[in-house]
Design a protein with these regions (language model features):
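Short beta-strand to alpha-helix junction loop
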Residues: 17-20, 44-48
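Active-site core segments that coordinate phosphate-bearing ligands/cofactors
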Residues: 1-4, 9-32, 53-236, 241-321
Length: 321
């Protein structure tokens, strides 16, 4: 078969020169990679090739299946949410949590706390970069808690979290899934819970504190992105993972001071629509995403108690880092 790659893929592999809009010869030279080893570059959204007849037969596919879309998980999540233009922002909170900002700016961080690469619909006439901020400890913390407390479902956990009005002074830090690039020197803080009182706290408080701690981590990351010059006043998410939790959504919105738009989509639907667009079944991006439905919108509400909890959380975090 024929080997090919995309500019997006090269940028994710730090082999793209954003200024020259070409393969980075500096990187190739440094690692002594010959230029002819770089495959042909094809568009992320568009016909890239076809699956061989033999492989179609092996996988039970019809003949001549076209490969017409490829993107990393976060550019694809953004595409699924119609986050395609400068200033638009997508998020997810699965095993890890991500804020993904589309911008026409060439933004970079010397300390690598965020990653910048081309967005899936970048082209020479309309620059679109994706700036990615990741929190490794997110849904994995909620999953760990579910197993540890032996609770049957996330739905039950969400209900328990709503039985209390606050976490009563508990502060949770979800950094137990390896090093966090958001902190200087890619620091591994480990997860921890602070302020536990055996006479006050029960499962509901602990569950709520975990949801708050994960949301606070994203809000902390948003502060950093804003300091980089990115305007973040609204975020789009799919109706999945931690964004199914009422408490998580409310804490995220009220502390970050951003509007939240929840849509009936996920990454698999986005990939299917991207492939259909790339193969010509849709005429443009707008048509491909026309069936996207907004199912919930949340506006930030003033919450002095939650702001105080976040302030205390950051104070404790600063001691850890």
């Amino acid at each position: 078969g024929n080997i090919s790659t995309t500019a997006l893929g090269l940028s994710e592999g730090i082999m793209w020169d954003f200024n020259k809009r070409a393969v980075s010869m500096d990187i190739l030279d440094f690692y002594q990679i010959e230029k002819d080893k770089v495959p042909d570059i094809v568009p992320s959204i568009g016909v890239q090739g076809k699956i061989s007849k033999e492989n179609c037969l092996n996988f039970g596919l019809v003949d001549n299946v076209t490969i017409s879309y490829r993107a990393g998980d976060q550019p694809n999540n953004a595409f699924s949410l119609n986050v395609l233009n400068d200033g638009e922002i997508a998020a997810t909170a699965g095993t890890s949590a991500v804020i993904y900002c589309v911008t026409k700016k060439d933004i970079s961080d010397p300390q690598n706390r965020v990653n910048t690469f081309l967005h899936c619909n970048d082209d020479i006439n309309n620059k679109r970069n994706g700036v990615l901020l990741c929190i490794n400890g997110s849904g994995i913390a909620y999953s760990w808690l579910k197993k540890t407390l032996k609770i049957n479902s996330y739905f039950e956990m969400d209900n328990l979290s709503e039985e209390v009005n606050s976490s009563e002074g508990l502060s949770f830090f979800p950094f137990g899934n390896g090093s966090e690039r958001l902190f200087n020197h890619n620091k591994n803080l480990n997860a921890m819970i602070n302020g536990l009182d055996f006479n006050i706290h029960n499962n509901s408080h602990i569950i709520r504190s975990v949801l708050e701690g994960i949301a606070f981590s994203l809000c902390y990351g948003i502060e950093y992105l804003r300091n980089m010059g990115l305007n973040i006043d609204s975020v789009k998410v799919g109706d999945s993972n931690l964004f199914k939790s009422k408490i998580f959504k409310e804490v995220f919105v009220n502390v970050s001071k951003t509007k939240l738009y929840v849509y009936n989509t996920d990454g698999s639907l986005g990939a299917a629509r991207g492939a259909a667009l790339g193969s010509g079944d849709y005429n443009n991006e707008e048509e491909a995403l026309s069936s996207l439905k907004l199912i919930e919108k949340l506006n930030p509400q003033e919450s002095k108690s939650m702001d105080a909890s976040y302030k205390n959380w950051k104070k404790l975090l600063n001691k850890l880092i």
